[in-house]
């Protein structure tokens, strides 16, 4: 269950963060999960908060499409609290992680 994933590193090349990261086009292509095949034998869900920045929502959608996975957009959650479900053993996120849906 990728949570708020950054799955395509190419957009980072055009940010000031890349002064530190130093990602080039070849590395962005090779290291971006969206360009890799999905893990085999897993029922995947890509989790993202509905109140996240548009880039995170798009990246989650992009990965879900590329991997043929379900995208879960959790209402009322943002990038820093979308992981709250990890603390609740009965949460939909934990059920997805355990394959219980």
Regions found by a protein language model. Name each.
Residues 1-101:
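Alpha/beta-hydrolase superfamily serine-hydrolase fold, recognizing
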């Amino acid at each position: 269950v990728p949570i708020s994933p950054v799955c395509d590193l190419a957009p980072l090349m055009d940010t000031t963060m890349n002064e530190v990261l130093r990602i080039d086009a070849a590395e962005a292509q090779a290291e971006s999960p969206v360009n890799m095949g999905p893990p085999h034998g897993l029922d995947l869900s890509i989790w993202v908060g509905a109140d996240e920045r548009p880039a995170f929502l798009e990246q989650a959608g992009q990965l879900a499409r590329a991997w043929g996975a379900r995208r879960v957009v959790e209402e009322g959650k943002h990038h820093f609290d979308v992981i709250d479900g990890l603390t609740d053993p009965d949460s939909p996120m934990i059920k997805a992680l355990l394959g219980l849906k």
